[in-house]
Every structure is written in C-alpha cells, then in structure tokens.
Amino acid sequence: MNERVLFVDDEESILRGIKLNLGRTFDVTLANGPEEAINIINEQGCFPVVVSDMRMPKVDGATLLRTIKQHNPETMCILLTGHADFEFGGAEALQSGLLFKILNKPCPPEKLKVTILAALEARDGKAPDEKAPDFVL
C-alpha cells in the first residue's frame, strides 16, 4: 500500500502537477493552503510525510510544519521554497529536526519523490498516530 503524503500549496496548478506526477507512487492528499491542511489532518489523522510550500497567505509553511510537528513528532516535514533566503530560520529548523529537508522550487518530480522516500526511510518504521488530537494554527 502506498504511503500517505499531504501536500500543501496555495497554487492549484502546483497541486495538480504533484498529484499527476506522484499519485502513482504515494497516496497523495492535496490541501489548498494551511487552513485546509489542518482541517484535513483533524479529519483524517496525521500523515507520515507533509510537504509544504513556504510562502502562502496568512500562515507560512514553516509555521504550519512547526505546528504539525508539535502535535505529531513522527511526521516527516519537507519545505519547498522558491526563495534562497532562510529568513524563517531554515538552517535552525533542519538542525533541530523540525524539517527533514528544504527543497528549492521548482523541484523536479523525481527529486521530490526520492526525498519523500528518504524521509519515509528515516522515519524508521515509526507510524504517526492515526488520529491525533485536533489542533489549530
């Protein structure tokens, strides 16, 4: 069975491309922004891997992933950014274990796939809670 992966982005075209390119390898769930991601997690339980864009309206990807990680430490978080700056503390987030990886956009589908597979391997068999307590941003 394919592993569940939640992708969060505020651009529909990016989400459609992810579903098209990675939908055969993973059980892909799409969220159009952080609020929808939280709603999905509250309804479906936590995901083994969450991939989020950095720059989104209202709540940025780093804040979203930090919130997810606080409630479910076993979730592997990957951040996509089209900006080279780490003003949000990207290096510290990697060192602290908050993020598994930061990838630059545009990210080739194969590189994203390999990174997700590596995150799943690094998770070392720890399954996230199927239904963690509800939380909000």
Please place each PLM-identified region on the residue numbering.
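Active-site residues of response regulator receiver
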Residues: 9, 53
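Two-component/phosphorelay signaling modules centered on CheY-like receiver
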Residues: 12-30, 97
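Helix N-cap/capping motif at the beta->alpha junctions
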Residues: 30-39, 61
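Short amphipathic alpha-helix used as the core "switch/output" element in two-component signaling
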Residues: 39, 62-74
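Receiver (REC) domain active-site loop signature in two-component systems and cognate sites
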Residues: 56
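Alpha4 helix (beta4-alpha4-beta5 surface) of REC/receiver domains from two-component response regulators
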Residues: 63, 84-102, 114
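Hydrophobic/aromatic residues positioned on beta-strands within the core alpha/beta folds
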Residues: 80-82
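C-terminal output helix
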Residues: 104-116
